[in-house]
């Protein structure tokens, strides 16, 4: 995939930290102003907008804000606003959507390899395949963490078709930008129990130094109240689930557990949805199996690029790969927590037809 060039939106208004310092100077105070990393580069105008939003304790930053009906960080809101204002979809665009820690890295690797298998043969691949030198997040960039981060407006004109992007946005906040005919959305979700445990581990690994670690019980309470990045998780899942039932040609819904159970069958389904089905000859040559093995959690985790490099917002790639298992939650949740989350899932997802395998 070609690398897009970036240009920043000029900031005519001083940063929030500078505004705050000016206010203190007017009051005759000259001490240094404590400043969190998440406030860097935010304008006074933007900070005023943030101050008007409901907020809760964050997982890896001080706060999460309720924006467009979901919870996210300040810098994410800045990027989302730029994306929604400037992104222009094209026919044949592919958008991969997930809630955090539900198999995003795996989905990116699988989709990239399916779409580019005629350029990079997975059967004959040695170290020349892009996955050996690039993390999947570099091959399929996020709207909110890469392309439009910090309010940037990227030039996407040089990207080869089909352009492939990723997002954690709920469907309601993505819908208007992907309505053009031919744009396809692939959604991957994971059972809420494992998603929670994976999120808790990951956020404590990458949290800001100014934020204390979130304890398991604290995180669990926030999660059950819907306060997690891009949550509530049930609304995120149901948004894509219902759209996939309404428009299966537009939105393809996958479960992490189904991929673990039968990766090859689901790869065939995914390729067909992307209008690049595997031929009989490809199946005889073992292309489907080769893609599954190349993109497997075990293989990706052992690659040097995923051990030492950084991709998303300078977070170390190694934190993206922990266990990749189903039912790891049994090692962490108490009986009362299992009961609470089970009741919540039944209440929020009951009657929708959306169910999960937990073990």
Swiss-Prot record:
Its main location: cytoplasm. This is Cytosolic sulfotransferase 15. Sulfotransferase that utilizes 3'-phospho-5'-adenylyl sulfate (PAPS) as sulfonate donor to specifically catalyze the sulfate conjugation of hydroxyjasmonates, with a preference for 12-hydroxyjasmonate over 11-hydroxyjasmonate. No activity with 12-hydroxyjasmonic acid methyl ester, cucurbic acid, 7-iso-cucurbic acid, 6-epi-cucurbic acid, 6-epi-7-iso-cucurbic acid and their methyl esters, prostaglandin E2, arachidonyl alcohol and 11-eicosenol. The keyword Transferase applies. Belongs to the sulfotransferase 1 family. It catalyses: a 12-hydroxyjasmonate + 3'-phosphoadenylyl sulfate = a 12-sulfojasmonate + adenosine 3',5'-bisphosphate + H(+). GO terms for biological process: jasmonic acid metabolic process; response to jasmonic acid. One of its GO terms (molecular function) is hydroxyjasmonate sulfotransferase activity. The active site is at residue 168. It holds the Pfam family Sulfotransfer_1. It is an enzyme of class 2 (transferase). Keywords: Cytoplasm, Transferase. It comes from Arabidopsis thaliana (Mouse-ear cress). It is found in: Cytoplasm. Gene3D superfamilies: P-loop containing nucleotide triphosphate hydrolases (3.40.50.300).
